[in-house]
């Protein structure tokens, strides 16, 4: 039986999602928990919708795994959460057909980037929002954001070590909202390149400070060169919010 699970995790104390020898990762903790639950000699492989870097959080990451156990859907979260550390939580579990794939069946992903605007650092937010105490021209930030919506070659907005050759992606939505003591950037796309959301966030903040004009975004897209765009915003402000599938 193939199980699809929606999980949340606090990325602060993890060395990213993917298993890495000698490091604490989300995938490693999930596979250890499943191995214990199944009383198996070997790991139960877990497939995710995609990897997240060290420090990046998830509200709605999706995983799948195959299991011979006859556990009711509603009981799976309880069974796994009892074996997982308290910075990972299984929120929902459902049985799916064998053709479902957490990564390849995904149609869209939503990320959010959190910014704290207080004058002084907040010790309770230091791992969960990027502290930006300086003034930002949000009208220009929103104007610049519109250039990024649509289908483009995002070479300028991904890390230079990105291995995939096709860097064309579609951004369906990109919007900013006031959270009271900060800002939230919400972005929905068909898929994202390595560091793409963080580079978009950092570049748009650079527009807000006046380093770039809104129209410069169009030039950056056409340049297809990472050096043309702005900074990479820190990992700790980024959240994988949800993964969207066909019903």
From Swiss-Prot:
GO terms for biological process: tRNA pseudouridine synthesis. Keywords: Isomerase, tRNA processing. The keyword Ribosomal protein does not apply. It comes from the Bacteria. Transmembrane segments: none annotated. It catalyses: uridine(38/39/40) in tRNA = pseudouridine(38/39/40) in tRNA. Substrate binds at residue 111. GO terms for molecular function: RNA binding; tRNA pseudouridine(38-40) synthase activity. Pfam families: PseudoU_synth_1. The active site is at 53 (nucleophile). The keyword Mitochondrion does not apply. Its EC number is 5.4.99.12. It is an enzyme of class 5 (isomerase). Belongs to the tRNA pseudouridine synthase TruA family. Homodimer. Formation of pseudouridine at positions 38, 39 and 40 in the anticodon stem and loop of transfer RNAs. This is tRNA pseudouridine synthase A. It comes from Bacillus licheniformis (strain ATCC 14580 / DSM 13 / JCM 2505 / CCUG 7422 / NBRC 12200 / NCIMB 9375 / NCTC 10341 / NRRL NRS-1264 / Gibson 46).
